Swiss-Prot record:
Family statement drawn from the similarity comment of this UniProt entry: Belongs to the NrdR family.
Top-rank taxon: Bacteria
A single MF term (Gene Ontology): DNA binding
Database matches in Pfam families: ATP-cone, Zn_ribbon_NrdR
GO biological process: negative regulation of DNA-templated transcription
UniProt keyword terms in alphabetical order: ATP-binding, DNA-binding, Metal-binding, Nucleotide-binding, Repressor, Transcription, Transcription regulation, Zinc, Zinc-finger
Cofactor note text: Binds 1 zinc ion.
Domain ATP-cone residues, every copy: 47-137
Transport as UniProt keyword: no
Name the UniProt record assigns to this protein: Transcriptional repressor NrdR
PROSITE patterns registered for this protein in UniProt: ATP_CONE (PS51161)
ZnF (unnamed) residues: 3-32
InterPro entries per the UniProt record, alphabetical: ATP-cone_dom (IPR005144), NrdR-like_N (IPR055173), RNR_NrdR-like (IPR003796)
Length: 175
């Protein structure tokens, strides 16, 4: 590891600790004596995002974070919530085991996470992601949020079980 202060290639590790997704190391340069911190993280195999125009772009967590931060700007959210969402989405994408994922899947994942976190951030992101061209489209999303309907479920879609057949008596009780 080269020293960031004098560029000498010889440094020694003073302290090493496990952090959330890697290892944090405190290092000291043997020439200038300056101390600095490095982080080691697992670098998964390349993951590519297939855009609407079929271009392929390497997945960039910083780009995801930037979009999330813009949507959540000036919102009273818990510290680290945006970073957690980005980390969760990244983990889900890599767990899929695919080399390429469509940008629509990534956008839908962000929408789902933001909807659970903050409605205003959700609407902000949706307005850019869904490319609203007029106020009626925005109003429809807001109305769906207020009424509790999910955009992905159509009114004509049948439920898994009819409402009259589901009763609290059918639950199993512990013995």
């Amino acid at each position: 590891m080269n020293c960031p202060y004098c560029s000498h290639p010889d440094t020694k590790v003073i302290d090493s600790r496990d952090v959330d997704d890697g290892v944090r190391r405190r290092r000291e340069c043997v020439v200038c004596g300056q101390r600095f911190t490095t982080y080691e993280r697992f670098q998964p195999a390349g993951l590519f995002v297939v855009k609407k125009d079929q271009r392929r772009e390497e997945f960039n967590k910083e780009k995801l974070l930037s979009g999330l931060r813009r949507a959540c700007e000036k919102r009273p959210l818990p510290a680290g919530a945006v970073d957690k969402i980005a980390g969760d989405i990244e983990a889900e994408l890599y767990n899929m085991g695919k080399a390429e994922i469509p940008s629509t899947l990534l956008g839908d994942m962000v929408m789902e996470k933001l909807k659970a976190l903050d409605n205003i951030a959700y609407v902000r992101f949706a307005s850019v992601y869904r490319e609203f061209t007029d106020i009626t489209q925005l109003k429809k999303v807001v109305d769906n949020l207020v009424s509790g309907q999910d955009e992905g479920i159509h009114k004509g879609q049948l439920s898994l079980l009819p409402e009259d057949r589901v009763s609290p008596k059918t639950r199993y009780q512990r013995r």
